[in-house]
From Swiss-Prot:
Coiled-coil region: none
Source organism: Prochlorococcus marinus (strain MIT 9312)
HAMAP family found in the cross-reference section: Ribosomal_bL17
Signal peptide residue numbers: none
NCBIfam families in the record: L17
SUPFAM superfamilies attached to this UniProt entry: Prokaryotic ribosomal protein L17
Protein name: Large ribosomal subunit protein bL17
Biological processes per GO annotation: translation
Gene field: rplQ
Keywords (A to Z) from UniProt: Ribonucleoprotein, Ribosomal protein
Amino acid sequence: MRHQLRIPLLSKPADQRKALLRGLTTQLIREGRVTTTKARAKALRNEAERMISLAKDGSLASRRRAIGYIYDKKLVHSLFEKAQERYGDRKGGYTRIVRTVSRKGDNAQMAIIELV
């Protein structure tokens, strides 16, 4: 039964879903914005905000957790350097989801997720 699901399943097995979200999170932190489907953007928001909260904490344990999740180690170091000055006064809401036009091939709802 699907009682109290906290993450959307995205029609993928658990390992593929985790790899997809890790890749999207890495791309979002690197580029600052990602165009994807609306469901993936909503799932990505949770992971990206968790990584930015770890970076704001700045402890060695949170740095190691971020290195274990984000694919690029240099990207983790730059995130930890910039997060405190960029998001120091914010308590959350580090991302913004903007809906765009539907995808041409299958009419899927698309969205742009970007860092605030």
